[in-house]
């Protein structure tokens, strides 16, 4: 150590710290002061610092516990997503539980454990215990109400109510699944679906779930009165009971009627009944019913349906191989008077259940072609037949299709009501039917609502005439109907129509041959048939149509057509009254006697295109 008196101008290097006694004493005094400050019992902040030894603990166990809790939470989330919700209480249980809180704990069957704990099951406040005795007295009454509710579900199903069907949102899907499990065949494979409950059908397939064996005899008794054929089968398994009925009713019934019949007979709800018509054109469905009918466990009554026999029996299979013949279809349309393609197609398709040729027609892929050819051939035959007939023969043929019992006086009274001289009208009408030159057109004019169109239309309807309309005059084919009729009508002719007639149809009014342009054919020369015209214009009073005055015969209707208090016409201009009119004035109209014409060696024989079927022996 250097002396303290060393000169400060030189460098000074400190190698060791110098210790002095006075510094040590100062540190000791400071430590004593610090200890005395924090160790006094009077201090409120004693033991402020925790200087005890610290331990790390088991952090790995804590992490494992947290990870386990997270995994359990994820697993519960997946279970809630993929598993069904807990079963809900049924309507019967809810009704019973609502009677009393204590009644819920009393049941006949075994109860399922609840998911939650029941807390405070016994209240020792004294109030609940005082009410317990009164509620126990009403237990028998509540149980009796519970039994009544169960019995109201139906006698046929109360013994085997399935929880899965009662709780299923789609009852029909559940019934279809149970039907397939019980029978082994899908219900939709045996039936075809009717969306409307009002649609009627003769045959119905009925499947009733949950019917006991005692109710089967009721079905046999009730259905036997209303059915021509009945197939009853009771399918039993460990889980399901199905009653299957194939019923052929005497009259067509809708689904609503069938459901009402079954519910009233078996005392079951309509939710447990499936009713659809059978697939009568399915070979597989027909074979199923045929094979099941041979089982001793199946009750059958009545004759086998035709649709089933045609697809299962051998003789029907051989008969179904018949090919379609167009001549038979044309013969049928000709005999029934069908000339429109839509009518021919519709009514011949309906005939398929009875006629083999119609059945072959439905099985063909060229139905549209056959219908078109049939309509065309019938039109040709009808036109040729009409052309070969005289006016007397045509009227006689048309009147044969009308019933008897008319009164000719209605027509005569109507003509007198319109102030038309009856003798003059009969002369003009006779000349019109005979086609006398210059007398081939009959005009009826007058104010509106006098019955002009009604009078002419009724006559045209009974004679099967045709109408031409001036609205089609821009077409060159608007006169084509004149080539295929015996009498025609131009209704409500206006001034442009009379101008057209004055320019182009003078020779037609004369009754001379005219040339008519036909569609898809060359122009054809025909004799214009008798023509009736209704109009509000008096042609003979106008000089501009002076060349038509000698070619037409006019009658004026002056009075408005009368109606009774019910809105019905006062004069009945019907087909039967026109038939009576022609029969009464047949000779006055110079119509020939058809019986004399047949005796002259010209028998009226209907057209025969195919051999008639031999009549069955009596």
From Swiss-Prot:
Q: Which residues carry this modification: Phosphoserine?
A: 85, 100
Gene Ontology cellular-component terms for this entry are: host cell nucleus
Q: Which GO terms describe its molecular function?
A: ATP binding; ATP hydrolysis activity; DNA binding; DNA helicase activity
What stretch of residues is annotated with the motif Nuclear export signal? 99-108
Q: How is it modified after translation?
A: Phosphorylated. Sumoylated.
Positions occupied by motif Nuclear localization signal: 79-81
Instruction: Identify the enzyme class.
Output: isomerase
* E.C. number(s) listed in UniProt: 5.6.2.4
Give residues for the crosslink Glycyl lysine isopeptide (Lys-Gly) (interchain with G-Cter in SUMO). 527
What protein family does this chain belong to? Answer: Belongs to the papillomaviridae E1 protein family.
Q: What is this protein called?
A: Replication protein E1
Species, as recorded: Human papillomavirus type 63
């Amino acid at each position: 150590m250097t002396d303290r008196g060393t000169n400060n101008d030189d460098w000074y290097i400190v190698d060791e710290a110098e210790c002095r006694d006075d510094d040590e004493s100062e540190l000791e005094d400071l430590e004593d002061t610090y200890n005395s400050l924090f160790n006094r019992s009077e201090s409120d902040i004693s033991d402020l610092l925790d200087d005890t030894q610290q331990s790390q603990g088991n952090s790995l166990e804590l992490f494992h516990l947290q990870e386990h809790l997270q995994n359990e939470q994820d697993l519960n989330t997946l279970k809630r997503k993929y598993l069904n919700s807990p079963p809900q209480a049924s309507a019967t249980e809810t009704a019973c539980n609502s009677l009393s809180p204590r009644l819920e704990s009393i049941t006949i069957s075994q109860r399922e454990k609840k998911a939650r704990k029941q807390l405070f099951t016994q209240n020792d406040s004294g109030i609940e215990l005082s009410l317990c005795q009164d509620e126990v007295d009403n237990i028998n009454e509540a149980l009796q109400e519970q039994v009544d509710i169960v019995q109201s579900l139906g006698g046929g199903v109360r013994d085997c109510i399935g929880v899965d069907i009662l709780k299923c949102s789609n009852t029909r899907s559940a019934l279809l699944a149970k039907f397939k499990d019980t029978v082994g065949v899908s219900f939709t494979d045996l039936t075809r679906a009717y969306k409307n409950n009002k649609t009627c059908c003769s045959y119905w397939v009925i499947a009733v779930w949950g019917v006991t064996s005692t109710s089967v005899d009721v079905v046999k008794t009730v259905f036997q009165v209303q059915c021509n054929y009945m197939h009853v089968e009771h399918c039993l398994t460990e889980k399901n009971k199905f009653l299957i009925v194939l019923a052929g009713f005497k009259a067509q019934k809708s689904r609503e009627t069938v459901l009402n019949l079954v519910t009233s007979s078996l005392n079951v709800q309509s939710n447990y009944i499936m009713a659809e018509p059978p697939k009568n054109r399915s070979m597989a469905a027909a074979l199923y019913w045929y094979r099941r009918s041979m089982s001793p466990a199946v009750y059958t009554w009545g004759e086998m349906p035709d649709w089933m026999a045609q697809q299962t029996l051998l003789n029907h299979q051989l008969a179904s191989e018949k090919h379609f013949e167009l001549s038979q279809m044309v013969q049928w349309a000709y005999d029934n008077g069908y000339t429109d393609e839509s009518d021919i197609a519709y009514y011949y398709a309906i005939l398929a259940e009875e006629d083999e040729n119609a059945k072959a027609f439905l099985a063909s892929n060229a139905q549209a072609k056959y219908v078109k050819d049939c309509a065309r051939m019938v039109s040709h035959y009808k036109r040729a037949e009409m052309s070969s007939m005289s006016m007397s023969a045509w009227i006689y043929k048309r009147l044969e299709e009308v019933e008897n019992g008319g009164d000719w006086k209605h027509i005569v009274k109507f003509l007198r009501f319109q102030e038309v001289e009856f003798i003059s009208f009969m002369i003009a009408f006779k000349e019109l039917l005979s086609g006398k030159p210059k007398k081939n057109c009959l005009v009826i004019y007058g104010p509106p609502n006098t019955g002009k169109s009604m009078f002419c239309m009724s006559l045209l309807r009974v004679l099967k005439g045709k109408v031409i309309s001036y609205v089609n005059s821009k077409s060159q084919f608007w006169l084509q109907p004149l080539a295929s009729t015996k009498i025609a009508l131009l209704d409500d002719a206006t001034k442009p129509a009379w101008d057209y007639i004055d320019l182009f149809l003078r020779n037609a009014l004369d009754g001379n041959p005219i040339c008519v342009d036909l569609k898809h054919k060359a122009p054809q020369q025909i004799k214009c048939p008798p023509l009736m015209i209704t109009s509000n214009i008096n042609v003979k009073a106008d000089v501009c149509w002076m060349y038509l005055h000698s070619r037409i015969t006019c009658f004026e209707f002056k009075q408005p057509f009368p109606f009774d208090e019910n809105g019905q016409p006062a004069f009945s201009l019907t087909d039967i009254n026109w038939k009576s009119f022609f029969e009464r004035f047949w000779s006055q109209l110079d119509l020939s006697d058809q019986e004399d014409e047949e005796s002259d060696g010209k028998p009226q024989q209907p057209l025969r295109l195919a051999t008639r079927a031999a009549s069955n022996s009596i």
